[in-house]
């Protein structure tokens, strides 16, 4: 371009050239984040929507999918209501009800049928609802009623409840463990009846710890012991270690329980001998709390250990020809993001892969995080960062694909066949609806709010369907993998 200012025509040529140059430069810049609109399609790659239910516009936490006779039933725990709508309307009863548990028939995943809402504790957000669900058949429990199906759920933060849901549309309360605070993400072994309950026992120095119960006869719960980190127990002094978030047991066959402490900071992975935990000395002294522990791994203070998902022994492709340690014992850890729009106070939360082959000295060997720039997620509203993974160990996906929720980035399908090199192979970001709630940050002392998807927890079933629920009241999305992601599994082509 020649910058000569002799004539008006040349001036016009210069101006036109500058406009073209500016347009070219802008074309190379990432597009500004667009606020989602009602009616926009979902964003997806190698995953597709099969079915949807709005869950009566309730903020949802944990989906548990249970094969019940010839039916498949989803038991979905809910957070408490919002300040604006503390008791959403249940159109089946015509009554406003505090959030609790949604029971949905997903036998036909394309046409889920809402069966029952079971109200939870009065209260909003974390103070109310009934977030957690686990389900066992009575015929599997050593002392259960063979004709019963048992739902273990939290009741707000105050209790754990057991219901008979053999008729899922008409649950019946069987037992209740109350006098607690801050109950949360528990684990129940159906073959033994041993339950690891995330509880807050008032005498302990921490908000959440573990109560181990024998629920082999759900009508007659028997407490086995209390457990936590030394320094959390009654009568201890000094610094109180990071609170518990949850755990996953491999049962008597694997003889391990993997505990995760910390949500978005101060994370600890704890590997525990299950037999010693259940049958060892019960008094919560520092020595007794240490006795069943095989190994611990302290994470960075910047990240938590929300979900600790044991993958077990895996052959690592790059080590396949090694004569020693070609198999590695792997654990997947997922943190939970808590702060909206990537604001100060929290590091980016993500997923981590831990080699626990030497159980006394586990170590992180890989990580994965959704690239923020791929969707300008920090600008979309709500939380951006990981939250939780599926926990099913059914063969259809186990050690092949993991599904991890990323709040406003939806659910991500991660190829974990080589856990030293995980890679994303698909995603699904649901579309917002009229029910989707806003999320706010403070700007100059005032609320600045955006409506955003907040994909919360995810689970899979043995058939290969993926169930993701939304924290921002959007509902339940039932998905399946397609294309290259599906080829990783043994599922038939779709």
Question: Model-found features: residue ranges?
Answer:
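N-terminal secretory signal peptides that target proteins for export/translocation
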Residues: 1-13
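Bacterial N-terminal signal peptides
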Residues: 13-28
């Amino acid at each position: 371009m020649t910058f000569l200012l002799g004539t008006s025509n040349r001036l016009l040529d210069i101006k036109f050239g500058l406009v073209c140059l500016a347009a070219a430069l802008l074309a190379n810049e990432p597009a500004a984040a667009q606020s989602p609109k009602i009616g926009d399609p979902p964003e997806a790659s190698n995953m597709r929507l099969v079915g949807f239910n709005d869950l009566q516009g309730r903020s949802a936490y944990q989906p548990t999918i249970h094969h019940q006779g010839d039916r498949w039933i989803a038991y979905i725990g809910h957070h408490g209501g919002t300040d604006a709508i503390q008791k959403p309307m249940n159109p089946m009863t015509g009554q406003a009800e505090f959030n609790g548990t949604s029971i949905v028939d997903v036998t036909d995943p394309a046409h889920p049928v809402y069966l029952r809402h079971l109200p939870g504790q009065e209260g909003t957000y974390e103070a109310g609802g009934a977030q957690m669900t686990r389900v066992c058949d009575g015929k599997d429990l050593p002392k259960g009623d063979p004709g019963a199906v048992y739902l273990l759920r939290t009741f707000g933060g105050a209790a754990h409840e057991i219901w008979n849901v053999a008729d899922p549309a008409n649950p019946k309360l069987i037992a209740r463990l109350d006098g607690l605070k801050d109950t949360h993400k528990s684990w129940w072994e159906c073959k033994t009846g041993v339950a690891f309950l995330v509880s807050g026992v008032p005498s302990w120095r921490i908000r959440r710890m573990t109560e181990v119960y024998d629920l082999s006869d759900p009508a007659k719960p028997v407490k086995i012991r209390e457990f936590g980190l030394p320094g959390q127990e009654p009568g201890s002094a000094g610094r109180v270690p990071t609170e518990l978030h949850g755990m996953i047991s491999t049962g008597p066959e694997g003889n391990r329980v993997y505990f995760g402490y910390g949500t978005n900071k101060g994370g600890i992975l704890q590997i525990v001998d299950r037999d010693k935990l259940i049958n060892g000395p019960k008094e919560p002294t520092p020595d007794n709390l240490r006795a069943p522990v095989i190994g611990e791994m302290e994470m960075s203070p910047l990240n938590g250990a929300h979900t600790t998902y044991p993958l077990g022994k895996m052959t690592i492709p790059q080590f396949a020809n090694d004569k020693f340690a070609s198999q590695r014992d792997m654990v997947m850890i997922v943190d939970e993001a808590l702060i909206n729009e990537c604001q100060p106070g929290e590091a980016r939360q993500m997923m981590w892969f831990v080699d626990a082959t030497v159980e006394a000295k586990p170590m992180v060997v890989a990580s994965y995080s959704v690239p923020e720039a791929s969707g300008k997620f920090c600008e979309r509203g709500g939380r951006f960062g990981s939250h939780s993974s599926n926990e099913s160990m059914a063969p259809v996906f186990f050690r092949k694909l993991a599904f991890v929720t990323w709040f406003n980035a939806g659910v991500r399908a991660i190829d974990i066949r080589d856990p030293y090199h995980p890679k994303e192979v698909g995603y699904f970001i649901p579309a917002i609806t009229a029910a989707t709630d806003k999320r706010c940050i403070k700007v100059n002392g005032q609320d600045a709010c955006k409506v955003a998807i907040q994909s919360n927890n995810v689970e899979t079933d043995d058939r290969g369907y993926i169930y993701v629920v939304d924290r921002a009241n959007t509902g339940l999305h039932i998905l399946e993998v397609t294309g290259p992601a599906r080829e990783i599994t043994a599922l038939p082509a779709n």
